[in-house]
C-alpha cells in the first residue's frame, strides 16, 4: 500500500498505463499472428498485405514505449525475410 499521496498517484498511473500497454501489445500480437497464419498457408499476397498492415502497428508500439525499437526491427526483419522466401 502506498504511504504518500505521491506514491498512491503513481500506483494509479501504473495500473492505467499497464492496461493501455496490455491492450496495445495484444493488438500488435494479433497483427503479427495474421502474418504468421498467411505465411503458414503459403499465400504470398495475403502475407504481404498482412505484413504491410502490421508494420505501422509495430512502429506505433515503439513510439508509445510498448516495444524497444530493436525488438520491433528484429520482428519486422524476420517476418519480411519469411514472406520474401515464399514462392
Curated annotation (Swiss-Prot):
InterPro entries membership: Ribosomal_bS20, Ribosomal_bS20_sf
GO MF, one annotated term: structural constituent of ribosome
GO cellular component, as recorded: small ribosomal subunit
Domain of life: Bacteria
Statement: the UniProt record of this protein carries the keyword Nucleus: no
Record family assignment: Belongs to the bacterial ribosomal protein bS20 family.
Protein name (record): Small ribosomal subunit protein bS20
Amino acid at each position: 500500500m502506498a504511504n504518500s499521496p505521491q506514491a498512491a498517484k503513481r500506483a494509479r498511473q501504473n495500473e492505467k498505463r499497464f492496461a493501455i500497454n496490455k491492450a496495445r501489445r495484444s493488438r500488435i500480437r494479433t497483427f503479427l499472428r495474421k502474418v504468421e497464419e498467411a505465411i503458414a498457408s503459403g499465400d504470398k499476397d495475403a502475407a504481404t498485405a498482412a505484413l504491410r498492415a502490421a508494420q505501422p502497428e509495430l512502429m506505433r508500439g515503439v513510439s508509445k514505449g510498448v516495444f524497444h525499437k530493436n525488438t520491433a526491427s528484429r520482428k519486422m526483419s524476420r517476418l519480411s525475410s519469411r514472406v520474401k522466401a515464399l514462392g
